[in-house]
C-alpha cells in the first residue's frame, strides 16, 4: 500500500472514510454522466433551415425527408410562406440556409443576401372551385359573374401577380372578396366554403384533391411560373445548403417535384 494512502487514512478518522469514498464515487458518476450527455448532444443532427414558397409545401416536405434520410447528421426544417414574406424575413435578419421562391422577382429582391439562383421547377395556374363545381364555372370570364365570391392571392404574392396577369390576358376584371397572403390561403377559403372560386397553381389542386376541384385555364391565357432556389450567403451550414440545392436539381429531386405536379423549369 502506498505511503501516501497510509498517511491519508491515519489522518482521517475511520468513521469518515466510508462517507468520503461514497462522495467521491457520486462525483465520479456525475462527471461521467455529464460527459456522456455532451457526447449525446453532439450526435444530434443540426437543423438546415429552408425558406420555401407555400406552394412547395408538399413537394419540399418530401424532399426534406428524403434528404434527411440520406444525411443522418442533418435535419431539414422548413418555413413555408408567401415568397415576399420570406424575403422580408431574410432582410430583417431571420436565419436561413436556403431560399426557394415562386417567382424570380422575389428572388431578385433578396439581392446580395443569396448566392446565384437556379431555376428548378415550373407551374401553371388553374381555377379552383368547390367540389363538384356547383357554380358551373368554365372559364376566367365566369369569375366576373355577379354574386360569385372570388378569392385571390394578394398582388404582391407571386400567385396573386400571376392571377392578375392571367385575368389581364383574358380581358376579365374581378373584384375579390378577399386577398390572401399566400396561395394556400386561397385554397383554404374555397375548401371551407368561404369562397366560390379562386386562381391557384395546378399543384395546389393536386395537393387538395377531394377538398377543391380545378377548371383548366387555356394556354393563351395561362402563365408559367418559374421557381428559383439559392443558398443564403450568411447561412449557418453552407455545405449542407449546397448539397440540398444539388439534390433538388438532381434527377431524383426532379422526379419528386414532377410527382407533385410541377413542370420542368422553364
Regions found by a protein language model. Give the residues of each.
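Short, high-confidence coil segments that cap the C-terminus of an alpha-helix
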Residues: 73, 95-96, 195
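Sec-dependent bacterial lipoprotein signal peptides
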Residues: 1-32
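Short, structured active-site "lid" loops
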Residues: 93-102
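Exported/periplasmic ABC-transporter solute-binding proteins
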Residues: 3-4, 30-69, 84, 88, ...
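Acidic/His-rich segments in extracytoplasmic proteins that coordinate ligands and/or metal ions
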Residues: 87-92, 108-115
Amino acid at each position: 500500500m502506498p505511503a501516501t494512502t497510509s498517511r491519508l487514512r491515519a489522518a482521517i478518522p475511520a468513521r469518515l472514510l466510508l462517507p468520503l469514498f461514497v462522495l467521491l464515487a457520486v462525483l465520479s458518476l456525475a462527471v461521467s454522466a455529464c460527459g456522456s450527455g455532451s457526447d449525446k448532444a453532439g450526435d444530434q443532427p443540426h437543423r438546415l433551415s429552408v425558406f420555401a414558397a407555400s406552394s412547395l409545401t408538399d413537394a419540399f416536405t418530401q424532399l426534406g425527408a428524403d434528404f434527411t434520410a440520406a444525411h443522418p447528421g442533418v435535419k431539414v426544417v422548413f418555413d413555408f410562406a408567401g415568397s415576399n414574406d420570406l424575403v422580408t424575413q431574410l432582410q430583417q435578419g431571420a436565419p436561413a440556409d436556403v431560399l426557394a421562391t415562386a417567382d424570380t422577382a422575389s428572388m431578385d429582391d433578396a439581392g446580395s443576401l443569396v448566392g446565384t439562383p437556379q431555376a428548378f421547377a415550373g407551374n401553371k395556374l388553374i381555377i379552383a372551385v368547390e367540389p363538384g363545381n356547383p357554380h358551373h364555372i368554365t372559364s376566367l370570364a365566369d369569375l366576373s359573374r355577379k354574386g360569385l365570391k372570388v378569392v385571390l392571392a394578394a398582388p404582391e404574392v407571386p400567385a396573386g401577380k400571376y392571377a392578375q396577369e392571367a385575368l389581364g390576358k383574358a380581358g376579365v376584371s374581378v373584384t375579390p372578396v378577399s386577398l390572401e397572403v399566400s396561395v394556400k390561403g386561397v385554397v383554404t377559403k374555397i375548401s371551407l366554403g368561404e369562397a366560390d372560386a379562386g386562381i391557384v397553381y395546378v399543384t395546389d389542386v393536386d395537393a387538395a384533391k377531394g377538398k377543391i376541384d380545378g377548371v383548366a385555364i387555356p394556354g393563351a391565357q395561362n402563365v408559367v411560373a418559374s421557381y428559383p432556389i439559392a443558398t443564403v450567403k450568411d447561412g449557418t451550414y453552407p455545405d449542407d445548403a449546397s448539397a440540398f440545392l444539388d439534390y433538388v436539381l438532381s434527377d431524383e429531386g426532379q422526379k419528386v417535384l414532377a410527382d407533385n405536379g410541377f413542370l420542368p423549369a422553364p
